Amino acid sequence: SVTNRGGLPEYPAPGQFKGSQDQLLRNNGDGSFVSITIEAGLARPSRGLGVMAGDLDGDGVLDLYVANDGEPNQAWIGDGSAGFHDAAMEMGLAINIFGQAEAGMGIAHGDVDGDGLEDLIVTHLISESDTLYRNLGQGHFEDVTGARGLAHPTIDFTGFGTLLFDGDNDGDLDLVTSHGRVLRGSTHAMAAGSSHWQPYAEEDHLFLNDGQGRFRIDAKSGFATRVGVSRGLAGGDLDNDGDIDLVITEADGSLRWWKNQSEPSSWWLLNVIDPSSNRTDLGAVVEFHDGDKLQRRSVGGGGSYLSGSDQRVHLATRNEGERSLKVRWSDGTSESFQVPPHRTISTLRKGQGE
């Protein structure tokens, strides 16, 4: 058993147990799955908590990124035939700017600075800030956490679920993170839940993007008024009104639905479908140009912590520039589509573009 200085039992730290290998399961197409972990090259024990799929090196092939608890993260680069190798260290995604492995929990992914490249954010344990890895292109990333305003506001919190989404419908990606300790601390004056969980309670955070990839805490939304032990976090337009709502789970409490009450002027929800399977084309990328501003949104990919978000692509803008819409499908082909009428839910089907 593990106890703190006061003799009270605590949850064991990751260094006190062995990790196990992650699993890659292939869908047999009949409702069953088979493990291809060993033949895919993924049979390496670790303490994985967060995972996402996306094209990390820009070669058109899906890769896997794993946030590990207390050891270097893994960037499994795909070879296009279900084989992978870990390139996290050379890509700049394994450790932070100080050369330290951190207690990785959840992952958020998206283009935070509008340069057309998908960046990564990983949440961590208290005393470790969340880490923002900026995509430099050609498979290289750098830790820009401090420069983008995330170091100081996150270092005193334990982050789990996280999501990059356009919370205020201005065309750039904002950041939300759910918090809850794993070690007892001083009890927050507004802590909810039972007496057992109150010393673990923390406020969640919503950060607004200034359009250049720098973040500040939103103090006006009332989002931080709930203080609990948050874990899972997912986003989606639950009421189909054109903005992204949030769902958060707690270790000791009911599920919470945060209804987005912003009033977007122009918005779109896009289902991105491959008719050959009649399914969402996971790994596809939607590029929306509005004047000189680019919104790049990937389809699906996972992330956060033990959560799955709405797979529809959400676009919003306050601009009135010339607009264009393009989809790069997961097989590497591309099509242009007419921009649907704004304030609508539409479907983009492969083969029906230009």
For each predicted feature, which ranges?
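Repeat-based blade/solenoid architectures
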Residues: 18, 39-52, 93-108, 149-163, ...
